[in-house]
């Protein structure tokens, strides 16, 4: 669904764990990382699109997550000119996104990047809450900053446990 201004309707998904970290996924066969996202189909609500994309991209079902909140408005970003497909009609110049903040209720093992026949991601990890703002591709950075700022109080209030410290092995001599 591309609107009259050339923006494609899209949903973005931020999944947080009980440590206040967020899921960060690497695009299949690329070096770029991002949050799961995807288009809203004709006749589909933003929430319906979010659940469909959640399963297609990371293999999670509604019972695996709790929806904590969503953005108050649609956030937009423009694609760089090199990524705009001028031969497609209508021309899509960017995305308008409704974002959802989810809390993972299940174990990490429920995440399955190959749940659909065409994986979007080939790796994922938990990262600190603000990490994605600095790491996402530059043309998405402003939207990421806005959504992370809007969700911060909610996301960080659901941190129920401290991140386990990695055990460091002591070298023994002798």
Curated annotation (Swiss-Prot):
Motif Nudix box per record, residues: 38-59
Alphabetized InterPro entries for the sequence: Nudix_hydrolase, NUDIX_hydrolase-like_dom_sf, NUDIX_hydrolase_CS, NUDIX_hydrolase_dom, RppH
The EC number(s) this enzyme carries: 3.6.1.-
Protein name (database record): RNA pyrophosphohydrolase
Function: Accelerates the degradation of transcripts by removing pyrophosphate from the 5'-end of triphosphorylated RNA, leading to a more labile monophosphorylated state that can stimulate subsequent ribonuclease cleavage.
HAMAP family: Nudix_RppH
Residue ranges of domain Nudix hydrolase in the record: 6-149
Required co-factors: a divalent metal cation
Lineage, uppermost ranks: Bacteria, Pseudomonadati, Pseudomonadota, Gammaproteobacteria, Alteromonadales
SUPFAM superfamilies linked to this entry: Nudix
Family annotation (Pfam families): NUDIX
CDD domains: NUDIX_Ap4A_hydrolase_plant_like
Record-linked Gene3D superfamilies: Nucleoside Triphosphate Pyrophosphohydrolase
Similarity field: Belongs to the Nudix hydrolase family. RppH subfamily.
Top enzyme category: hydrolase
GO biological process terms on file: mRNA catabolic process
Keywords annotated in UniProt: Hydrolase
UniProt GO cellular component terms: cytoplasm
Organism: Shewanella oneidensis (strain ATCC 700550 / JCM 31522 / CIP 106686 / LMG 19005 / NCIMB 14063 / MR-1)
GO molecular function per UniProt: mRNA 5'-diphosphatase activity
């Amino acid at each position: 669904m591309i609107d009259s201004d050339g923006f494609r309707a899209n949903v973005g998904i931020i999944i947080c764990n009980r440590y206040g970290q967020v899921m960060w996924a690497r695009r299949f066969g690329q070096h770029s990382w991002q949050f799961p996202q995807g288009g809203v189909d004709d006749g589909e609500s933003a929430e319906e699109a979010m659940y469909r994309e959640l399963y297609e991209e990371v293999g999670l079902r509604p019972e695996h997550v709790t929806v904590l909140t969503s953005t108050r408005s649609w956030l937009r970003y423009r694609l760089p000119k090199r990524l705009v497909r001028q031969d497609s009609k209508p021309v899509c110049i960017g995305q308008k996104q409704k974002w959802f903040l989810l809390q993972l209720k299940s174990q990490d093992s429920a995440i399955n990047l190959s749940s659909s026949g065409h994986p979007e991601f080939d790796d994922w990890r938990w990262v600190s809450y603000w990490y994605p703002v600095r790491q996402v591709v530059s043309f998405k950075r402003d939207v990421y900053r806005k959504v992370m700022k809007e969700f911060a109080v909610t996301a960080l209030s659901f941190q129920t446990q401290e991140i386990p410290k990695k055990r460091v092995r002591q070298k023994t001599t002798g």
